[in-house]
C-alpha cells in the first residue's frame, strides 16, 4: 500500500466517524518553546491546555514533523530520521479510552477491501501503563487481545506529560511483531527491534504537579475534561504494509535514493559507507523541501540554521558519493513528485523552493572544496603534533570564512578520529558577536569611534537636555563631525553630526526613537535633523544634512523639534506603559517587558510568555487600556532615588541601566515605571489604542503590535468599511457575518466536491477507449497516450490503473499515460503481474520516460510516477517506453 493511500485511508476512516479533518499545520511552530513542530499534537496544544476552546469535539490530521536531536545518527542507522508524518486522532472531552482503543484496532485490522490496513491481529502486541487496569480490561474484554500479548510498563515508557505542570496521563502503545528474523520473542518489553511501536494512544485524564523528568512528579487529581491524543508514524506503518526492512525503503524514500544513485552511479546496497550517505541525502532532502516549503530559509540562527545544517550535510554526502555538479534540483523534483499529491503547495511553490535550495547549494559549493582543504591541513597538523583535539580557532575560521556549520566540522573531524575545542570556538563566536554589535552601533550613529565624542564632551561638557519641558532651545554648536571625524565647519549638502550645548531633541533610548527637526544657525544656515543618538553618555548627537549655508563650531543656533511627531511618539510611549501593566494584570509578573519600540502613532511591545496569549485575554487587555484612557488619568514624571522608586513599586524598563537618581513615570493609580522617555500629560490625549495582534519572536518571547490615536481610528474606519461592504454583499448584520460566510464556504466546498467527482468521471470515461487502443509489442499489450492538460497526478494514476484492469485474458499489460501540469510533463506507468513476470517493472519504465522528459521519477514495480521539464518530448518518451518494452520483455 502506497504512503499516499495510507494517508487517505486514515483521514477517511476518522472523517466517517465524526472527526473534523484538520490540514497539517506549518512546520514553523506557533509556540515560542518550539523551534519546529516535533509531534502531531502540537497544533492542538492550546486546546489540551485549556487556553482556547476547540471548535470541534473530534479531530484528525496527518501532521508534518521534524525532529533533529539525533541528526548525527541519521544514515548510520535505519531508525533515525529528521522528517516524518504523524497521523493522529484527537478527542476533546468526547470519547475516551474505549473509543480510542476500538477505533485503533478497527482501522489496523479491518481488511483492506473494507477500508482498513489489513494487519494480522495475531502480530499485534499491546503495552499499557502498569497501573492502568481499565485500559488492559478494554484490550482484553472488549477487543479480545489475549492476555499474553498485553504487557504492563512503567512511567518511563507508558506515561505522558509535557514535562511541566499540566495535563498528563497513561498511554497505551500498539506494537507490530516483525518476525523471528528481527530477534528473540518476548514482546516489546523485551525487544523493540522486533516489536515495533506503530501507534501510541495517550489518555489525558490527570493534572500533573511539580516534579522532575518523566517519572518523578505528583498527580494532583483528575481533569474536568478527559482528552485523547494519539499518534501513528505513517512511514513506520508504510514500512510494514510495503513489506520492506526499514523506512528508507518505502516508496517516498526509495524514489529519492534511486535518484541519488542515478546521479552518482553508486547503487544502494553496494557498501555500508555509501548506504549511510544515500540515507543521509534521502532524509535531509525530504526535510529540506518541507522546511523551505513552509517558509524557512537557510541562515545562521534558529530554524534557518537547522535547514542550512541538513542541506549542507546532504550536499557533502552527495560529494562523498561522487557527484561533481549541482544536484539539489534533481533531488527536489523527486521529493515533490512523491509528496506533491499529499501536499499540493509543494507543486505550486516549486519554483521558490528550488530557488532557495539552489542559492544555498551554490553558496556552499563555492566554499566546500577550499574549506575541506583547510580542514584537511588542520587535521594533518594536529595529528603530526600528536594532538587529538582540533583547535577552536580552526573551527572558527571554517565557520566564519568558509560557512562550515560547527556540526559539520565536528562530524568531519570525528571521521578523522579528532574532537574539536568547542569552548574555544564558542569564545571566538562570542567575541565576534560583540564586535558586530559595536560595529552596528557605530554605523547607526555614524561614528568611527567614541574618541571624537569624548573629546567634545571633555571640552564642552555634557549636553543639557531640556526636551521634557521645551520643544525649542537657544543653543551653541560645540562640535561638528563630517564622515566620522571632527571638523571646524560644514557646508551646504554635507551629511553632518552636530553636538549642541543644550537641546530639546530626545536621543533614542528606552525603546523610543530619536527626535527629528531643524537647527537654524544665526548666520542663516539650516540643518535638517533626521535622527538624534547618544553614542557616549551625556553627548547628544544630531544627525542630518546642511540644507542652506555654512555651519561652524561656536555658532549660535535655535534648535526645534518636529512637535507633531514628538506628540505622536509620546502617545505611543504612554500606551506602551499601559499595555505593559494591563498584560501583567492579566498574565502575572512573568509578562515582563523584553523590549519595545515607540514610533509616531504605533508601537510594538515584547514580553515574556511561554505560550501564545489567548484571543479572549488580548481582547480584555485592549479593553482595559481604553478604559484607562477614558478615566482621564494624569501622567506625572518625578525624579527620585533608586531605592525610593523600588519602594514605590516602580517597574524597570527592559535593557536599561539606572543610576542613583531615576525618573519615574506614573499614570494615575494604574502604572508606575522607571522611564526616561517622553509622555502625554493625560491619558485622554491618547484617544484610542488598538492592539493588532501578538506573535512569537523567539523562545518564550511574544510581540504585540499596536496603533494609537488617529492611526488607530483610521485602522478601525477601514475595518468598518470592509464590514459594511460585506454586509452589502451578504445581506446580513455584522454579527451574522461569520455564520453566513461559514455557510457559504460549506456550500462552496460541496460544489467543489461535485466538480471533482464530475471531473474524475470524465477522466475515467476515457479508460475504455484507451484499453481498446492497446498495441501488441512482443506479446505485451502496450497502451500509451496523452490525456488532456491539467489532469492531476491522482486522476492520471486512477486512469492508468483503470485501463490496466480492463486488459483481460491473462495478457501482459503495460499502461503508460502522459499529461502536462502547469506546462511540465507528468507520467504514470503501471504493469500487471503477467508483465512483471516478463521483466517489465513500472519503476524502470518511468525512469526511462522521465529521463527523456528531462526529469526523474520512481516507484514500485507495479506502478510508478515521474515528471520532467520538457513537455515537447512526450512523444519521444512514448517511443522510449515502447523500445524498452520491446527490448526487455522475455
From Swiss-Prot:
Keywords: Aminoacyl-tRNA synthetase, ATP-binding, Cytoplasm, Ligase, Metal-binding, Nucleotide-binding, Protein biosynthesis, RNA-binding, tRNA-binding, Zinc
Keyword Cell cycle belongs to the record: no
Entry's cofactor comment: Binds 1 zinc ion per subunit.
Enzyme Commission number(s) from the entry: 6.1.1.7
GO molecular function: alanine-tRNA ligase activity; aminoacyl-tRNA deacylase activity; ATP binding; tRNA binding; zinc ion binding
Keyword Cytoplasm belongs to the record: yes
GO cellular component, one term: cytosol
Reaction(s) the record says it catalyses: tRNA(Ala) + L-alanine + ATP = L-alanyl-tRNA(Ala) + AMP + diphosphate
Annotated localization: Cytoplasm
Pfam families registered for this protein in UniProt: DHHA1 (PF02272), tRNA-synt_2c (PF01411), tRNA_SAD (PF07973)
Chain sites annotated for binding Zn(2+): 573, 577, 675, 679
Cofactor(s) named in the record: Zn(2+)
GO biological process: alanyl-tRNA aminoacylation
SMART domains: tRNA_SAD (SM00863)
Primary localisation category: cytoplasm
Cross-referenced Gene3D superfamilies: 2.40.30.130, 3.10.310.40, 3.30.54.20, 6.10.250.550, Bira Bifunctional Protein, Domain 2, Threonyl-trna Synthetase, Chain A, domain 2
Notes concerning its domains: Consists of three domains; the N-terminal catalytic domain, the editing domain and the C-terminal C-Ala domain. The editing domain removes incorrectly charged amino acids, while the C-Ala domain, along with tRNA(Ala), serves as a bridge to cooperatively bring together the editing and aminoacylation centers thus stimulating deacylation of misacylated tRNAs.
Record function comment: Catalyzes the attachment of alanine to tRNA(Ala) in a two-step reaction: alanine is first activated by ATP to form Ala-AMP and then transferred to the acceptor end of tRNA(Ala). Also edits incorrectly charged Ser-tRNA(Ala) and Gly-tRNA(Ala) via its editing domain.
HAMAP family: Ala_tRNA_synth_B (MF_00036_B)
Similarity remark: Belongs to the class-II aminoacyl-tRNA synthetase family.
Name assigned to this protein: Alanine--tRNA ligase
Native organism: Streptomyces coelicolor (strain ATCC BAA-471 / A3(2) / M145)
Gene: alaS
